[in-house]
């Protein structure tokens, strides 16, 4: 009988500990659902649509001298927020964390020039496209790269988390890659001569080369053509449907051609045609 009481005490303590642990697990599981995407009603109540964009990728998404976001992606972001009846709240992201910001519910939409790929479709849901691109390679004019074979034994600059990084790792492992988190750092590396060339979407390298004398896009199209589209958290059908409906409606108003004229034409001029880049109403032609 002497041993029964201590055993009962130990048993009671064990049950209490088990209960506390179970409660802790329950709270932990509950907190993990905190990353769930906001509903449209919640977005409207907050008064803000959180949009992931680039802050250093002119003319698509960048911060001007006044600290305001500008660019082709921003035009769409402004319109989506307006049509929801809220204000846009832009959040600067790197190429590598565009999906993560959606998954962790730090933003509602990603408009950071996000190329649609099968791998990314496993992480996020893409809406209808609003732009078409392929890869391009820019290099100094006096040592211009016009063929991928010329990159063998040379250093190619890429930005982490981009289709350029994936493409070269998969198809051209013989090319040495020098990787950067930010586009601005990657371009600066090219200017400093730390690499022989830089690859990303052809729309971007073309815009950059036009503003930086002494550089040329020697490879204007590489790999398969891709599309760029807004993305939402996986399973967020409500917001996805809204974006798709809005893109189709905006297409009837020729919205994306107007956005091109306002944000991209001043950079490209006659070097590019709107119909070669713009996707109107989500229909790729």
Language-model segment annotations:
Residues 18-22:
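C-terminal motif of bacterial Sec signal peptides marking the signal peptidase cleavage site
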Residues 24-26, 74-83, 162, 229-269:
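Extended ligand-binding regions for polar small-molecule ligands
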Residues 25-34, 166-180, 217-221, 247-285:
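Ligand-binding clefts/hinges and TM-proximal coupling segments of bilobed small-molecule sensing domains
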Residues 31-113:
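Extracytoplasmic small-molecule ligand-binding "clamshell" domains
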Residues 42, 139-156:
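Flexible hinge/capping segments at coil-to-helix
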Residues 89-100, 143, 160-163, 178-188, ...:
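Short helix-initiation/N-cap motifs at beta->coil->alpha
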Residues 100, 114-122, 170, 191-192, ...:
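A ligand-binding cleft/hinge motif common to bilobed small-molecule-binding domains
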Residues 132-139, 206-247, 266-285:
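Periplasmic-binding protein-like
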């Amino acid at each position: 009988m002497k041993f029964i009481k201590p055993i009962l005490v130990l048993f009671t303590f064990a049950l209490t500990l088990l209960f506390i642990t179970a409660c802790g697990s329950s709270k932990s599981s509950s907190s993990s659902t905190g990353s769930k995407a906001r509903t449209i009603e919640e977005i409207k109540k907050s008064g803000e649509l959180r949009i992931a964009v680039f802050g250093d990728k002119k003319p698509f998404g960048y911060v001007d001298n006044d600290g305001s976001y500008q660019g082709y992606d921003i035009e769409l972001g402004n319109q989506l927020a307006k049509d929801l009846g809220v204000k846009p709240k832009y959040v600067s992201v790197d190429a590598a964390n565009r999906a993560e910001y959606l998954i962790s519910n730090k933003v509602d939409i990603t408009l950071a020039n996000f190329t649609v790929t099968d791998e990314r479709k496993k992480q996020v849901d893409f809406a209808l496209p609003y732009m078409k691109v392929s890869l391009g390679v820019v290099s100094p004019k006096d040592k211009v790269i016009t063929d991928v074979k010329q990159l063998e034994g040379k250093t190619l600059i890429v930005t982490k988390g981009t289709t350029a990084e994936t493409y070269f790792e998969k198809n051209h492992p013989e090319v040495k890659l020098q990787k950067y988190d930010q586009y601005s750092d990657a371009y600066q590396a090219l200017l400093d001569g730390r690499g022989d060339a830089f690859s990303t979407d052809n729309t971007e390298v073309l815009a950059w080369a036009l503003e930086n004398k002494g550089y040329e896009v020697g490879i204007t199209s590489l790999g398969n053509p891709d599309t760029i589209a807004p993305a939402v958290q996986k399973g967020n059908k409500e917001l996805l449907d809204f974006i798709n409906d809005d893109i189709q409606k905006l297409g009837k108003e020729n919205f994306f051609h107007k956005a091109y004229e306002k944000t991209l034409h001043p950079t490209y001029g006659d070097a590019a045609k709107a119909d070669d880049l713009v996707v109107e109403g989500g229909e790729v032609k």
